[in-house]
Swiss-Prot record:
Pfam families from the UniProt entry: Ribosomal_S14
An MF annotation (GO) of this entry: structural constituent of ribosome
SUPFAM superfamilies: Glucocorticoid receptor-like (DNA-binding domain)
Subunit structure: Part of the 30S ribosomal subunit. Contacts proteins S3 and S10.
Any one of the GO BP annotations: translation
Cofactor: Zn(2+)
GO cellular component: cytoplasm; small ribosomal subunit
Source organism (scientific name): Thermotoga maritima (strain ATCC 43589 / DSM 3109 / JCM 10099 / NBRC 100826 / MSB8)
Positions of Zn(2+) binding: C24, C27, C40, C43
Alphabetized NCBIfam families for the sequence: PRK08061.1 (NF005974)
Protein name, UniProt field: Small ribosomal subunit protein uS14
Highest taxon above the source species: Bacteria
Length: 61
């Protein structure tokens, strides 16, 4: 989990629009974030396996 101060700093509006970047809505991780869900790969996998993301299934081929 991101520290409370980091989350508060992340929520503040940026001075310049180009400085904004995607972060996970749950843990605040800045890397490997899926834009469509707003989640990092770790949180995405956890929620998908729990069945909390509608329409997401584990791939099988």
């Amino acid at each position: 989990m991101a520290k409370k101060a980091m989350i508060e700093r992340w929520k503040k509006p940026k001075k310049y629009k180009v400085r904004e970047y995607t972060r996970c809505h749950i843990c605040g991780r800045p890397r490997a974030v899926y834009r469509e869900f707003g989640l990092c790969r770790i949180c995405f996998r956890k929620l998908a396996l729990e069945g909390k993301l509608p329409g997401v299934r584990k791939a099988s081929w």
